[in-house]
Amino acid sequence: ALEVRGLTRAFGVRKALDAVTFDLPSRAFLSVFGPNGAGKTTLVKVLTTLLHPSSGTAKVLGLDVVDDAVEMRKRIGLISHNPLLYPDLTAEENLLFFADMYGIDQPHVRVAELLEAVELDHRKLDLTRTFSRGMLQRLSIARALLHRPEVLFLDEPYSGLDPHAMEILDGLIAQIRGDHTFVMISHDLDKGLELCSHALIMARGRIVLFEPREAIEVAAFRDTYRATVGMGVA
């Protein structure tokens, strides 16, 4: 599903990504770990076409993140820890707006289905500025799933969630993970390792470790992660 070769992204003289290379098979779940400034979010932004790489290449579903960006956006979804929603629209209006952008058939049916899945159907007519952070994140998840993406990118999706919202997100991931590829940034080692089929640790824009879950010895993995925390920004 992902083919990354020598991926580099520079901001001035600093390389937020420095020759990153890895492959991820279809229907895998990759958890990405690393300290602040390691390049995790920059990696996701490049892979979701929000940033252009300075050099190197990346393909998602065989599509180049630069040359095939328009087509690729139709087949991927992004769940951010900062929900991308309009505060002065209702929950239903938010989802219908994005459904129209994606050209979804029978948008009201799809929106109703997702509002029920994230347990917000009873709040569908309420303005989202009245929602708690957990509710906003749940609605953001519904938005990301509207067009049935094949690859889902999750940027710290559990950050700031209440226990109920965490349970809902766990359930949604369990329900769809067999048919999707996931890339999740996480600061929670336990949750990230619980979910993943592959794990990646970054520091200073580079890959420190990339292994399938079955090859990981948890204590050694924790030691490697702790060693990167003091490395800071490149």
Where are these regions (language model features)?
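The feature captures the beta-strand-to-loop junction immediately N-terminal to the Walker
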Residues: F33-P35
